[in-house]
Design a protein with these regions (language model features):
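Mid-domain alpha/beta scaffold segments of enzyme catalytic cores
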Residues: 23-134, 144, 148
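Solvent-exposed, acidic/flexible segments
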Residues: 44-51, 69, 106, 110, ...
């Protein structure tokens, strides 16, 4: 009996030492820099958050680079002019928030996109973030957007369901797509299946912290797909409304917390290395 108790105590002690060692290793590891692939700086933000304040928030949060799209595009270009090394511009096809619900069938939006790309040639590294769902991809506007993406060698940033992602690649297999929010509600199995199917699909994890790591603990399903596709996931926060700027540091802390539960090399890829490879 005493031997059994002693053996159990030794086993518990061993587990405690492993946990302690892991905690110490995490504490001693340098803080992960972040390449945030989901930032907006739209018109409602501009008065309360001038560019210098925005850049200060990013710096304090350890966001060394950011993929930025805005409604309208002027917000993105303003930030880029202030800090071109940190800010990577992409072109959102929204002149106002009202464009969100119909941009995919509005020739005027297409004209706006073409004009901005031409006027600022080489500045925008993608088109998006845009909202597009299954059954909406069969318009001339969407077809032309996919053609522009291939022609200009730039990415699409799609806030879409799984069906729309499939439809986009069916429309133009040469696309390079960043799937915003991992589909917002798609689970790790569905995300993994699309990554298996499309080698030029990447996934940003903005707004998915509570799904990826409920209660702060990395979900086993998400962990498995991260390990299976370590080169295809991207960190993100999403400042979709003005109040999100105050929430951004906390969101970044949550991202670092669940990434710390992965092997360091995988964590670094998701935190910044994958995005740096896409946007060198």
């Amino acid at each position: 009996m005493r031997l059994r108790i002693a053996a159990r105590l030794l086993a518990l002690l061993a587990l405690a030492l492993v946990a302690l060692g892991t905690a110490i290793t995490r504490a001693q590891s340098p803080e992960l820099p972040i390449f945030d692939t989901h930032i907006h700086y739209s018109a409602p933000d501009w008065i309360e958050y001038p560019p210098e304040r925005i850049l200060g928030i990013l710096e304090k949060a350890g966001i060394r680079r950011a993929l930025v799209s805005s409604t309208p595009d002027d917000g993105t270009l303003t930030l880029h002019a202030k800090d071109p090394k940190r800010i990577v511009p992409i072109l959102r096809p929204y002149r106002t928030r009202g464009d969100m619900g119909h941009w995919w069938q509005d020739p005027a939006v297409l004209a706006y996109v073409q004009e901005r790309l031409q006027k600022n040639r080489g500045v925008h590294k993608g088109i998006g973030e845009f909202h597009l769902f299954g059954g909406q991809t069969g318009t001339f506007v969407v077809k032309r957007i996919t053609e522009l993406a291939v022609q200009e060698n730039i990415y699409l940033h799609a806030h879409s369901d799984e069906l729309a992602i499939i439809e986009l690649f069916t429309l133009e297999p040469r696309l390079r797509v960043i799937w915003a929010h991992a589909g917002m509600s798609s689970g790790p199995q569905a995300v993994g299946a699309l990554l298996d199917r499309y080698p030029t699909l990447w996934v940003d994890l903005a707004i998915r912290n509570s799904d990826v790591a409920p209660g702060g603990t990395l979900d086993p399903g998400w962990r498995a797909v991260f390990l299976r596709h370590p080169d295809r996931f991207l960190a993100g926060t999403d400042t979709w409304m003005t109040s999100r700027w105050e929430a951004l540091p906390g969101s970044v802390t949550e991202v670092r917390s669940y990434l710390s539960q992965l092997p360091r090399d995988v964590a670094e890829k998701i935190a910044f290395r994958n995005a740096e490879r896409l946007f060198p």
